[in-house]
Amino acid sequence: MALPKLNVPVYETILPSTDKVVKYRPFLVKEEKILLTAMESEDNTIVTNAVKQILKNCIQGKLNINELPTFDIEYLFLRLRAKSVGEKITVGLKPFPCAQNDGKLCEKSTEVEINLEEVKIKKDKSHSSKIMISDDIGIKMSYPDISILN
């Protein structure tokens, strides 16, 4: 007797760098455990590898995570987190010196709620990866990928 197949919702998003449609599922308990374990280590390499593994597990179809620009990975992870845990997060700013308090630390921290579904990538229409040095010579640049983080 075969094990039952879990039915999980599948979502789509568009990669900012290529406008390619990517299908993904929310992360499950096993992916959340990978992330929590990595965050406890406080080692950037372990956290980066955990994010890559979670994306590989949750993205459907062929997509090479190692070749994606870092902003695509961050965007995908935000979308994944929004569908898995919840769209809204609360970000707290620590007390900081402010002019209204004669340069002393403000007494209260500031909390801001962010809806991850509303996070958008703004692309300049004139953006190009080509940089012309002269009329005849140019350089084609590439976006940094996740390997630069290790």
What name fits each language-model region?
Residues M1-N150:
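Long C-terminal interaction/binding lobes of large macromolecular proteins
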